[in-house]
Amino acid sequence: MRIAVLSGAGISAESGVPTFRDDKNGLWARFDPYELSSTQGWRDNPQRVWGWYLWRHYLVADVAPNAGHRAIAAWQDHAEVSVITQNVDDLHERAGSRPVHHLHGSLFEFRCARCAKPYTGELPAMAEPALEVQPPVCGCGGLIRPDIVWFGEQLPDEPWRRAVEATESADVMVVVGTSAIVYPAAGLAELALSRGAAVVEVNPEVTPLSASATLSIRETASQALPGLLQRLPALLN
């Protein structure tokens, strides 16, 4: 069986990673998300944007994969599994999943905003949240930015291409913890359905996908995913 997993913020929220809408420590609560996650916000105040992302980087480093992440990784022993994620954390990888296609980038990868060269140098230490942090500087003189897809930016070509390939070849797509409103990622479930794959939605809340999904499970990832692989044949018949 070939399984494509599309994961969103809900699965990581169970590990203590705030969702994007909640991911603002008191220092940044007064800022609109656009100010912290856009090229315009970066141009206006790169120190503030860097401070916010560096705080998120260290926050995620301190949490652990949950039962949902571990279940998906365990499926690899019984099926061909590809993970497509809208999340910018590394919890799928730490649980053991391979491959993982990050559609929106990663909090653990950085690049020069000017020349795009990847940055693997030291990061500023952060014992506690700081409103503004000076970004590292590339050899070309450009500032180092998080390798994250900001508002208005295109998805990275290679992860998107591989996500589409995994979706097109899947027998089953499991959509977990995503609102199903952020495109183009939300269109992957529609693509899977159009190609005859079963789409299983795992989400405590009703989403725009719920009406068309083959099966909707109103549970969290850590509740539904352990044991789901063994239950799939009966659930889908």
UniProtKB/Swiss-Prot annotation:
Cofactor: Zn(2+)
Entry binding sites for NAD(+): 8-28, 86-89, 177-179, 203-205, 221
Cofactor binding, note field: Binds 1 zinc ion per subunit.
Keywords: Cytoplasm, Metal-binding, NAD, Transferase, Zinc
Main location: cytoplasm
Residue positions of the active site: 104 (proton acceptor)
List of residues binding substrate: 53, 56
Enzyme class of the recorded protein, top EC level: transferase
Cysteines engaged in disulfide bonds, as pairs: none
GO MF term set: histone deacetylase activity, NAD-dependent; NAD+ binding; protein-malonyllysine demalonylase activity; protein-succinyllysine desuccinylase activity; zinc ion binding
UniProt protein name: NAD-dependent protein deacylase
Organism: Mycolicibacterium paratuberculosis (strain ATCC BAA-968 / K-10) (Mycobacterium paratuberculosis)
